[in-house]
Amino acid sequence: MPLPIVAIVGQPNVGKSTLFNRIINERVAIVEDRPGVTRDRNYARASWMGHQFSIIDTGGITWEDSTIDEEIRAQAEIAIEEADVIVMLADASQGVTSLDERIAHLLYRADKPVLLAVNKADNPEQRTDIYDFYSLGLGDPIPVSGSHGTGIGDLLDEVVKNFSPDAEKTEEGVISFSVIGRPNVGKSSIVNRLLGEERVIVANEEGTTRDAIDTPFVKDGTKFRVVDTAGIRRRGKVYEKTEKYSVMRAMSAMERSDVAILVLDASTGIREQDKHVAGYAHEAGLGMIIAVNKWDLPKKDSSSGKDFEAVIREEFSYLDYAPIVFVSAKTGKNIDQLPKMVKEVYENKNQRIQSSVLNDLLLEASRLVPAPMVKGKRLRVYYMTQVKTNPPTFVVFCNDPELMHFSYQRFLINQLRENFDFTGTPIKILPRKRK
């Protein structure tokens, strides 16, 4: 099961981003920031009272005619579709506005839990004024102050009450993967070809809140679940072509995935949108496979394949761990290799290395390349241990974490890759001061 998703929506300038940031700072723990549309820092994974969830901050909803306003509204509507719980934020100092009423009517149609939070209720008089917001028909208004932090705990208590009891459970023994990429690269065709070639189709399951089709199947005795981002219903060609729309669709799929297959179009080459989606998947810590589709076209031979692979390695240098496979959804070329590759990446991503073996490697690495001097002070590395899998994460204890330059972390990652099979998975190094 995917993590529950909470969307914060409302008109402009009611304090949505302030509330979002306050939740991140005030809750018990932030699991990790999620990039993507996230250069705007509007997507994070969080927890409250033991409940993990993803939270989305959206732009202010208006019904102006400008292209920017239309795109912002489209993004908010996508977030509403994705969400399990919606928080509508209003402004106590403004009172109930016509925009609030229009947004409330939009949320009536969502057919999912909606909580009404009234921001800037900073004093008793403003808290009394919130009763006007009952007119929106969204239940009891919850007074909050994003700037001061009051009422945030009460709001989050109500949020987690609305999570499905099964929302945070995971299905054992099933490898979930998503097929991601910009529009029209052949994602849906690859999924259809993949499923059409399987001997056993277990069942089709439609996501109850997301309109994305998760399809379980069995291949060579292994249970898989493919998340087809193309199954999310479209909102029209103008939004289908926007970069953020594509990333939002990919984000939803990645929340339900162990591994992502990034599909590139051999006929059009690499676009900026490809890099945006790939960057999100990489920073989210997913296992990665790069599938170059439409390799059935003329003039696609082994020589041009090597050339294209070189371009991929240059453009996606941060994905140097991801295997590349040339496929054709039209002819079926190499499609049957994808489940096998997904399984291998999943296993690599979840392997655990004994500390004694790691420290032997660390000792040998120190002999090969002595720890560097930084500002006249030498880095001293003492020992390494693996603290988690999925993705593999290693803590390296040293005399001063600030002395461990990125280049030395990269060296240690390369040593790990040379000695163990981490194909397809990112590796994280966390320097820590030895106590």
UniProtKB/Swiss-Prot annotation:
Protein name, please? GTPase Der
User: What family name appears in the similarity comment?
Assistant: Belongs to the TRAFAC class TrmE-Era-EngA-EngB-Septin-like GTPase superfamily. EngA (Der) GTPase family.
Q: SUPFAM superfamilies from the entry?
A: P-loop containing nucleoside triphosphate hydrolases (SSF52540)
The gene name reads der
User: What NCBIfam families does the record point to?
Assistant: GTPase_EngA, small_GTP
Q: Does the record bear Oxidoreductase in its keywords?
A: no
Q: Which PANTHER family match?
A: GTPASE DER
Matches recorded under Gene3D superfamilies: 3.30.300.20, P-loop containing nucleotide triphosphate hydrolases
Q: Where is the KH-like domain?
A: 351-435
